[in-house]
């Protein structure tokens, strides 16, 4: 039974109402510093920890709760007579409920004007110590680190005579250990990122020790293949526009491959300002287009490769209305992603309950780093978020691209970034015409892209081509020109750039260099 609670929080969200409810249930309240003042000002009967222990706060508040009367009351096992006798001998009542959250270390170091001294002062000592004590003794002590759990604890107390059951206590304890591990990980990441000057402003992007924290969203039926087990985890600092924040409106449970492909589709479609549609198959775009609206964009994207679009993942950057829904519903689709779906669109898909509908807010979707596991290690890099500005482009051929060609080139370049290397993308009039992906030879990607267009009945005459990396020889360029391309955009940087540029001039096409490569593996 909970008779006495100790409350000490930095995040005071909901704490007054929670403490009042505890007091109404007859629970004695102990508290520290600002929390105690807040509760007292609200008219609640509260005892300062300093008065409770008979020992004042000291060292500018660094020592408040580090006292046997606090930790003895938390750690004592109620089922061990010798523990309870020791408490009685020293006049220590039990503390049955601990409500603590920690100094805002992560928020502090995120500030541009944060100093090392500021960071150090926001490393909580007493809070984690109490939390770990209570979590260790969770059989007898209820510990709350998250304001979202206040209602859960109160409901259980009211239903069970001020008692919280072991399953809840265990869940809350595991939450505490996860929280303190993440807190210590953030401190380690920060301190090991400091350079020799030990100044906040001189932090390295890549700390000497990297701690990562994720919460499990769900277990998955299997992984990339049926013989592999899998689960999906969410980054604790997930941006609003991230796939992990999806809201599923209908459909079967997402699979491992659904999630991986959906991320590729969503990240690609968000890069367009005009209404856009992206169709993904095996993490590669097989159709991308912009249009007057979602239905128009889908119709154009689907034309690129109707065969590959079968069973694909489709993403829109605008609301899916009834017209778009009716067009998509004619095909077999695994997942449909959009910022929103109209009521009429939802009605269209109500007859196709296996189709997974995901709503995600538009916005940034990834944190600062891209991670890839290798045997025994982890590759960490900044995101490939570089967007080439028109002022950075260099026309290196005798012929300048027309305004329309430049629009097509920039569209193709945007798509090529999301195609597995080696990538060759033919585009025209705001849509992909042929996509060559993932080949070991760039010239083979060029051939495949032109074959794809031919199979779809699309002409490449007057098309624009993007290559995610430079042409090592002129052969790849010769292939795309033979297919009908009149302009090419590529990074440049080959030892044979002069030869490739000369070939472009020989063909009478325009070539634009970006100076930026977009390998994708």
Curated annotation (Swiss-Prot):
CDD domains: IMPCH. Residues 1-145 form the MGS-like domain. Its EC number is 2.1.2.3, 3.5.4.10. GO terms for cellular component: cytosol. It catalyses: (6R)-10-formyltetrahydrofolate + 5-amino-1-(5-phospho-beta-D-ribosyl)imidazole-4-carboxamide = 5-formamido-1-(5-phospho-D-ribosyl)imidazole-4-carboxamide + (6S)-5,6,7,8-tetrahydrofolate; IMP + H2O = 5-formamido-1-(5-phospho-D-ribosyl)imidazole-4-carboxamide. Gene3D superfamilies: 3.40.140.20, Methylglyoxal synthase-like domain (3.40.50.1380). GO terms for molecular function: IMP cyclohydrolase activity; phosphoribosylaminoimidazolecarboxamide formyltransferase activity. This is Bifunctional purine biosynthesis protein PurH. It comes from Burkholderia orbicola (strain MC0-3). The lineage of its organism: Bacteria, Pseudomonadati, Pseudomonadota, Betaproteobacteria, Burkholderiales.
């Amino acid at each position: 039974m909970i008779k006495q609670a100790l409350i000490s929080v930095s995040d005071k969200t909901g704490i007054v109402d929670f403490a009042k409810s505890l007091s109404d249930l007859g629970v004695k309240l102990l508290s520290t510093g600002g929390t105690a003042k807040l509760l007292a000002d609200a008219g609640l009967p509260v005892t300062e920890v300093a008065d409770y222990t008979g020992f004042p706060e000291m060292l500018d508040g660094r020592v408040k709760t580090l006292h046997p009367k606090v930790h003895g009351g938390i750690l004592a096992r109620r089922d061990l007579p010798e523990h309870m006798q020791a408490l009685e001998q020293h006049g220590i009542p039990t503390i049955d409920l601990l409500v603590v959250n920690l100094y805002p270390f992560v928020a502090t170091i995120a500030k541009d004007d944060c100093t090392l001294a500021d960071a150090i002062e926001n490393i909580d000592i007493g809070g984690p110590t109490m939390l770990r004590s209570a979590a260790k003794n969770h059989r007898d002590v209820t510990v709350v680190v998250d304001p979202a759990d206040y209602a859960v604890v109160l409901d259980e107390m009211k239903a069970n005579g001020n008692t919280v059951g072991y399953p809840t206590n265990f869940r809350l304890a595991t939450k505490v250990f996860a929280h303190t591990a993440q807190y210590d990980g953030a401190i380690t990441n920060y301190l090991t990122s400091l350079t020799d000057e030990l100044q906040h402003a001189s932090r390295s992007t890549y700390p000497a020790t990297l701690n990562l924290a994720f919460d499990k969203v769900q277990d998955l039926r299997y992984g990339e293949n049926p013989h592999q087990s899998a689960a999906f985890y969410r980054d604790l600092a997930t941006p609003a526009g991230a796939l992990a924040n999806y809201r599923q409106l209908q459909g079967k449970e997402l699979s491992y491959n659904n999630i991986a492909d959906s991320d590729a589709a969503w990240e690609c479609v968000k890069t367009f300002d005009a209404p856009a549609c992206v169709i993904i198959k095996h993490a590669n775009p097989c159709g991308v287009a912009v249009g007057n609206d979602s239905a128009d964009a889908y119709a154009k994207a689907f034309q690129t490769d109707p065969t590959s679009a079968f069973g694909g993942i489709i993403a829109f950057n605008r609301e899916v209305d009834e017209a778009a829904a009716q067009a998509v519903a004619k095909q077999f689709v695994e997942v449909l992603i959009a910022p929103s779906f109209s009521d009429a669109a939802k009605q269209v898909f109500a007859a196709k309950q296996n189709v997974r509908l995901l709503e995600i807010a538009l916005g940034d979707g990834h944190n600062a780093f891209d991670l890839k596991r290798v045997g025994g290690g982890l590759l960490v890099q900044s995101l490939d978020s570089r967007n080439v500005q028109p002022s950075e482009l260099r026309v290196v051929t005798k012929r300048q691209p027309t305004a329309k060609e430049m629009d097509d080139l920039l569209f193709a370049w945007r798509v090529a970034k999301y195609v597995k290397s080696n990538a060759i993308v033919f585009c025209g009039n705001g849509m992909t015409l042929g996509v060559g992906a993932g080949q070991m030879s760039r010239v083979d990607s060029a051939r495949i892209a032109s074959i794809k267009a031919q199979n779809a009945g699309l002409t490449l005459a007057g098309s624009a081509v993007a290559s995610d990396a430079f042409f090592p020889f002129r052969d790849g360029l010769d292939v795309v020109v033979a297919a009908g391309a009149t302009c090419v955009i590529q990074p440049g940087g080959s030892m044979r750039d002069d030869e490739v540029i000369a070939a472009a001039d020989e063909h009478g096409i325009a070539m634009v260099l970006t100076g930026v490569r977009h390998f994708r593996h």
